[in-house]
Every structure is written in C-alpha cells, then in structure tokens.
C-alpha cells in the first residue's frame, strides 16, 4: 500500500461548506493552545503548526482539518448543539480520518 501525497498535501487552501467559501490556513499557533479553530460566518479554518507547545505532526494536522470541517458541517445544518458536543465531533472525526486514509493507502 502506498500514498502518493504526503498527508499535509491533502489539506486544501480553500473548501466550500454549504455553498460558503472557507479559507484554510496553517498558522504558527492558536490562542489557548488549540490544534485548530473554525468559524462558519467568518469563512475560515485555522490549523496550528504548534499546539500546547508541541509541533503537530502531519497526521495530526489532517485530523484537525477534518475535525474543524465536522464542526462547520454541523453548524451549517443548524445543529450547533452537535458542533458543541466535542465527544461526538472527536468520534466522528476519528472514523472519517481512518476511512480517508484507508482509501488513500489502497491507491
């Protein structure tokens, strides 16, 4: 099994969620040591290069990107309650990330 792209290359610079453009960027760090942050109305996802004093690995950055996408999807469908349920978002993200990486490893 092989991967043609590195994991960090899988993170796009821009996505759309519910027809809204979302800019994606990797920043040095985020307040409070978060790995990532997103804002649907603000149209952005920010992924920290360093979180809580540690450099995030590429796999962690990909997981953070998907995690923030899940938050945005829930907010977009009007379910902020689901977006605020961090345990649900983490569980969903873990499964989605594993599926994506499994698909990539088969190509």
For the regions a protein language model found, what residue spans apply to each?
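A short, highly charged nucleic-acid-interacting micro-segment common to nuclease
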Residues: 2-6, 83-86
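Short pre-active-site segment immediately N-terminal to the catalytic Zn-binding motif
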Residues: 43-64, 79-80
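Catalytic zinc-binding patch centered on the HExxH motif and its immediate surroundings
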Residues: 3-16, 21-46, 55
């Amino acid at each position: 099994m092989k991967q043609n792209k590195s994991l960090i290359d899988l993170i796009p610079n821009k996505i759309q969620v519910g027809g809204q453009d979302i800019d994606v960027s990797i920043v040095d760090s985020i307040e409070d040591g978060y790995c990532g942050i997103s804002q649907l109305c603000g149209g952005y996802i920010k992924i920290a290069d360093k979180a809580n004093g540690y450099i995030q690995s590429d796999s962690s950055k990909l997981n953070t990107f998907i995690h923030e996408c899940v938050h945005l999807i829930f907010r977009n469908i009007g379910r902020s309650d689901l977006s605020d349920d961090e345990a649900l978002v983490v569980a969903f993200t873990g499964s989605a990330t594993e599926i994506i990486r499994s698909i990539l490893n088969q190509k």
